[in-house]
Curated annotation (Swiss-Prot):
The keyword Ligase applies. It is an enzyme of class 6 (ligase). Belongs to the class-II aminoacyl-tRNA synthetase family. Phe-tRNA synthetase alpha subunit type 1 subfamily. It is found in: Cytoplasm. Its EC number is 6.1.1.20. This is Phenylalanine--tRNA ligase alpha subunit. GO terms for cellular component: cytoplasm. Mg(2+) binds at E256. GO terms for molecular function: ATP binding; magnesium ion binding; phenylalanine-tRNA ligase activity; tRNA binding. Keywords: Aminoacyl-tRNA synthetase, ATP-binding, Cytoplasm, Ligase, Magnesium, Metal-binding, Nucleotide-binding, Protein biosynthesis. The keyword Membrane does not apply.
Length: 341
């Protein structure tokens, strides 16, 4: 028997053996017997080196073709074995569709999501629309169009997550303010909830990822009195009780004048704690009248249109409502904590 005939004989034997495999373990054994490192077909291939150049070409090509055919046949056989096993198990198993399910705990909304929906309801009842925007933003939308100077500290890499293409993870939902000013014709009232990112040192009151709701009203003769009234309505409906607040001057490039609305810390009731950094007060709501440069950048005449804007931190709002002393709980995924809400 020459080498070519020997290859044909081995191939036929392999087809018979592999095809008669009764399990995946049996299949693996039969495969190794023929095309494994010490298999019969592999042993023949080792003798090809002893042949003439012409025979090497012919026998080598034939051996490789048969080896590939056997590899494919092994795959087909394995698939067939799996199918037969499934059919056998399916035929022997019985599923009672009327059987009562075991008790399973129901899921629930995250406390931040709950308060977001609640705030959305409050503002939509006052005629506000809800807007959305991408979490990956351009430098222009996040900074430039909001009147941030090129050398503003917030643009630096220690405060902002920049991407390789020059875009960034938005640092505030104010970026949606820019998109809205371009998209809508005034007058309008909008809120824009979303997740924001800052390169923060994480502690009890700071996270690198947190949630805000941006609010903006644009119309004619909008004043600080309209802003303060809107904030008072919001806080009274959120906390359902009298909340001690203070309004102090604050600087934000996109508003003029700018204010900081602080509330008396509800975690320590104003006595001082890590959440309020022992001050008894917590910065909750930076706000102000929209800067004329922001309106001009969007193509609006600041002599004709005015407005106010605010940014509300949802994480801190939830902390105040429930007396939570550490903002890191929200991102922890701890079900013992989350199931309380």
């Amino acid at each position: 028997m020459n080498l070519s005939e020997e290859l044909d004989s081995i191939y036929q034997e392999a087809i018979q053996k592999i095809g008669s495999s009764i399990s995946e373990e049996d299949l693996d054994k039969n495969k190794n017997d023929f095309i494994g490192k010490k298999g019969k077909l592999t042993a023949v291939l080792k003798n090809v080196a002893l042949l003439s150049i012409e025979e090497k070409k012919t026998i080598g090509q034939k051996a490789n073709e048969l080896s590939k055919k056997l590899e494919n046949f092994v795959v087909e056989t394995k698939s067939s074995l799996k199918k037969k096993l499934f059919e056998t198990q399916a035929a022997s198993e019985f599923f009672d569709s009327l059987r009562p399910l075991p008790n399973a705990s129901n899921g629930s909304l995250h406390p931040i999501t709950q308060i977001q929906y609640e705030i959305e309801d409050i503002f939509t009842s006052m005629g506000f629309s809800i807007m959305d925007g991408p979490e990956i933003e351009t430098d222009t939308n996040n900074f430039g169009a909001l009147n941030f100077t090129d050398d503003h500290p917030a643009r630096e890499m220690q405060d902002t997550f920049y991407l390789e293409n020059g875009n960034l993870l938005r640092t505030h939902t104010s970026a949606i303010q820019v998109r809205t000013l371009r998209k809508l014709k005034p007058p309008f009232r909008i809120i824009a909830p979303g997740r924001v990112f800052r390169y923060e040192e994480v502690d009890a009151s700071h996270e690198h990822t947190f949630y805000q709701i941006e609010g903006m009203v644009v119309g004619k003769d909008i004043s600080a009195a309209n802003l303060i009234d809107t904030m008072q309505v919001l806080l009274s409906r959120i906390f359902e009780k009298e909340i001690k607040t203070r309004l102090r001057p604050g600087y934000f490039p996109f508003v003029e004048p700018g204010f900081e609305l602080d509330i008396n810390c509800l975690v320590c009731e104003g006595k001082g704690c890590p959440v309020c950094k022992q001050s008894g007060w917590l910065e909750l709501l930076p706000c102000g009248l929209i800067h004329p440069n922001v309106l001009s950048h969007a193509g609006l005449d600041p002599k004709e249109w005015t407005g106010f804007a605010f940014g509300l931190g949802l994480d801190r709002l939830v902390m105040m409502r429930y007396g939570i002393h550490d903002i890191r709980y929200f991102q922890s995924g701890n079900l013992r904590f989350l199931k309380q809400f």
